């Protein structure tokens, strides 16, 4: 498999085996931290990271009919921080979280002067003050890798973060033809 410059070679078999081992232990999100830890502090070594904001998010921000300034946004599974930083640049007060402590460390090191509030948190057990607190709830390429029952729980949790009259924006990569819904998806398959 061709990799981005500076990335370790991605082994899809080892990846699927590793994810399956966590899922077999009913720990559907535990494997995320191992990917970030394996990157050894190099955000470009996280094989699913695009290292730029989602073009779909940027398009939405540019075409949105309301002002962004002063609104609260939350980024679920923020990864290495590109989307959170884009939202901040558009004027949002951004809380961005990931279940991986190592991902949050990468964000803070990558963006040392940021105004984004990067936190370690679990979508299934987030701080109570987050409930119904955000005008924008943004999720990109995270819940798609969860097994079915957890995707349903994740959708419910996302809705519970949303303030009245707020927006949920979800962006994900589609599965390949023939892939089953609960198959462990291989990352970085993009079609535009």
Pin down the residues of each PLM region.
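Short catalytic micro-motifs in class I SAM-dependent methyltransferases
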Residues: 141-145
């Amino acid at each position: 498999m061709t990799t981005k410059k500076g990335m370790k070679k991605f082994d899809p078999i080892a990846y699927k085996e590793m994810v399956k081992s966590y899922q077999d232990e009913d720990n559907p999100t535990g494997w995320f931290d191992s990917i970030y830890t394996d990157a050894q502090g190099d955000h470009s070594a996280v094989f699913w990271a695009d290292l730029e904001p989602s073009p779909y998010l940027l398009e939405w921000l540019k075409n949105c009919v309301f002002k962004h300034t002063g609104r609260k946004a939350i980024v679920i599974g923020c990864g290495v921080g590109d989307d959170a930083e884009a939202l901040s640049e558009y004027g949002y007060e951004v809380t961005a979280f990931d279940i991986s402590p190592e991902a949050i460390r990468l964000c803070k090191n990558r963006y040392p002067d940021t105004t984004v509030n990067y936190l370690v948190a679990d979508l299934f057990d987030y701080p109570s003050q987050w409930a119904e607190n955000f005008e924008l709830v943004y999720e990109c390429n995270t819940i798609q890798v969860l097994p079915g029952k957890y995707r349903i729980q994740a959708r419910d949790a996302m809705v519970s973060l949303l303030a009245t009259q707020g927006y949920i924006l979800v962006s994900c990569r589609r599965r390949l033809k023939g892939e089953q819904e609960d198959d462990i998806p291989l990352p970085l398959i993009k079609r535009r």
